[in-house]
Amino acid sequence: MPFSAKTEYGLVALMDLATAHATGDLVQTGEICRRHAIPERYLEQMLTALRKGGFLKSVRGPRGGFLLARPPEQIRIIDVESCLEGEVSPARKGERQDPEFQALSELGNRLEQARAAILSETTLAQLVQKRDQMKQLQPMFYI
């Protein structure tokens, strides 16, 4: 059960903002778009939702931008996903009563519970740490 494009882009933007969080620097939408090739209008919608959800603060004006409203250690991934997508739950319409389908339904429920548990215990700070580890593993090409 991968993330939707909306949640992926939102999390990428939050990781970008988490990097600037330590210094308190504002990050402009255009900067995030350029660094991560995210369509600007789409990103603006997500950042607005994240601001309304209490994850971001915004400052208006030519030198304005966004910053995290709280430390990355206090932002859980499941909360970000819920903010951007609404409550995420599996869509199972008209479940069949056959034992085979009931067994599959039970398995699906267990998968959803495991996913929710992982996302509940994973913070933005942990995601940033994992990103930084992966950057260290990327080969450097010098010209």
Spans of features found by a protein language model:
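Alpha-helical residues within the helix-turn-helix
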Residues: 34, 51-52
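C-terminal regulatory/oligomerization modules of transcriptional regulators
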Residues: 96-143
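Key DNA-contact positions within bacterial/archaeal DNA-binding proteins
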Residues: 41
